[in-house]
Design a protein with these regions (language model features):
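A cytosolic small-molecule/anion-sensing beta-strand core signal
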Residues: 54, 70, 79
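Short acidic-glycine-tyrosine-enriched beta hairpin
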Residues: 64-76
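Histidine-centered metal-chelating micro-motifs
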Residues: 75, 79-85, 105-106
Length: 175
């Protein structure tokens, strides 16, 4: 039986793909910059995660079902969910996303409202299909968070990051 990796930190995810960690509780992901390319792994998420998949690179198994996604779709995962991923060998990864730890949103409006985002539900195994305009909005939200992560952590960091994540999630609800 394959070992299940406990994904309880942003750094753990970044280690898996050879990406840099800028903040201990949140990370903006660009898999085209990955330096490691695992082809088969099972993750037990301890984080929230949203990924805009720009290529169908293999299968994602969510429970006993295959996650329904294609190019240009958003997949989402929440703490406690176990996901098996099989990446087709030789496929260049192309996905953008965000990972954030539940501790980041404690005491924020996002923390109070996180359960309203139904796409994080374990029962959901369908990806959100985006139009070109919606993809631009998704990527723009990630860019704002990424810019904030490039600054040293200060008294405003948590508020600005969590509000921008909340904006991204609200857009995903609209889509």
């Amino acid at each position: 039986m394959e070992k299940i990796l406990k994904l309880d930190t942003v750094d753990r995810y970044n280690e898996l793909f050879g990406l840099e960690t800028l903040h201990p509780l949140v990370g903006v992901v660009d898999l085209s910059k990955a330096t490691k390319f695992p082809t088969h792994f099972t993750l037990n998420y301890g984080l929230y995660a949203l990924f805009l998949k720009e290529t169908k690179c293999g299968d994602i198994r969510y429970g006993k079902q295959i996650y329904d996604y294609q190019e240009g779709t958003v997949t989402s995962f929440a703490p406690g969910q176990v996901v098996e991923t099989e990446i087709t060998d030789g496929i260049k990864l192309s996905a953008h996303g965000i990972l954030f730890h539940p501790d980041l949103i404690k005491g924020t409006s996002l923390g109070k409202n996180i359960k309203q985002y139904s796409f994080f539900s374990y029962a959901s195994n369908e990806a959100l299909h985006l139009s070109e305009e919606e993809k631009e909005i998704f990527l723009d939200c990630l860019k704002k968070i990424s810019i904030e992560l490039s600054h040293p952590i200060d008294n405003y960091s948590k508020c600005l990051i969590s509000k921008n994540i909340e904006l991204l999630l609200d857009y995903c609800m609209r889509f």
